[in-house]
Structure formats: structure tokens, C-alpha cells
Amino acid sequence: MGLAFSGARPCCCRHNVITTDGGEVVSLTAHEFDVVDIESEEEGNFYVPPDVRVVTRAPGPQYRRPSDPPSRHTRRRDPDVARPPATLTPPLSDSE
């Protein structure tokens, strides 16, 4: 039995379940599959548990996503604009 995932079908994936093109709902839990020896398997489809899987290539560089635009409440100061002078008055002494 061959199962093919169709990316064109909307809402075909739920939690650990897929719906095939034929409308069959298939569970993807590990308990539903037999663990097989990879060395003895001939070029066929087989299931390998995640803890046994071997990564054959190093992950590529991770590119940073451009930052989100600043919030309306975040004010960015333009370095070309001079700062306004401080408007604080010195504290008054007791004699004044």
C-alpha cells in the first residue's frame, strides 16, 4: 500500500494524522509501525524511529529574519537630529 501526502489538499494534516488522496485517514504514531533493520532492507520504504535516525549532512547556515518594524510606541532617535537641551531645573535648597 503506498501512501502519498498531497500538499494541495487543505486541512489534510491533524495531530499525528494525515489524510491520503484516497480519503483514508492514517495515524502517524510510532506504535503503528514496525521497526526494521536498515541494513537488511532493500531500497524500499521503511520507518526509522527519530532516536535512530542519522543526519547525513550538517545543517546549513541559519539566516536571521529581518526584524519586525518597530512598535508605534517605540521611538527611534535619528542620529542626525540633535538632542533637545535638558529642561530639568536644579533642585531648590532650603534657603531659597
From Swiss-Prot:
It holds the Pfam family UL11. Residues 50-96 are annotated as: Disordered. InterPro entries: Tegument_UL11_Herpesvir, UL11_simplexvirus. The keyword Transferase does not apply. GO terms for cellular component: host cell Golgi membrane; host cell plasma membrane; membrane; viral tegument; virion membrane. The keyword Membrane applies. Myristoylation and palmitoylation (probably on one or more of the nearby cysteines at the N-terminus) enable membrane-binding and Golgi apparatus-specific targeting and are essential for efficient packaging. Phosphorylated. Phosphorylation does not seem to be required for recycling to the host Golgi apparatus. Packaging is selective for underphosphorylated forms. Residues 65-81 have a biased composition (Basic and acidic residues). The modification Phosphoserine is found at S40. Transmembrane segments: none annotated. Keywords: Host cell membrane, Host Golgi apparatus, Host membrane, Lipoprotein, Membrane, Myristate, Palmitate, Phosphoprotein, Virion, Virion tegument. Residues 37-43 are annotated as: Asp/Glu-rich (acidic). It is found in: Virion tegument; Virion membrane; Host cell membrane; Host Golgi apparatus membrane. It comes from the Viruses. It is a lipid-anchor. A lipid is attached at G2 (N-myristoyl glycine). GO terms for biological process: anatomical structure morphogenesis; viral budding from Golgi membrane. Plays an important role in the cytoplasmic envelopment of tegument proteins and capsids during the assembly and egress processes. Also participates in viral entry at the fusion step probably by regulating the core fusion machinery. Interacts with cytoplasmic envelopment protein 2; this interaction is essential for the proper localization of each protein to the assembly complex and thus for the production of infectious virus. Interacts with gE (via C-terminus). Interacts with gD (via C-terminus). Interacts with UL56. Belongs to the herpesviridae cytoplasmic envelopment protein 3 family. This is Cytoplasmic envelopment protein 3. It comes from Human herpesvirus 2 (strain HG52).
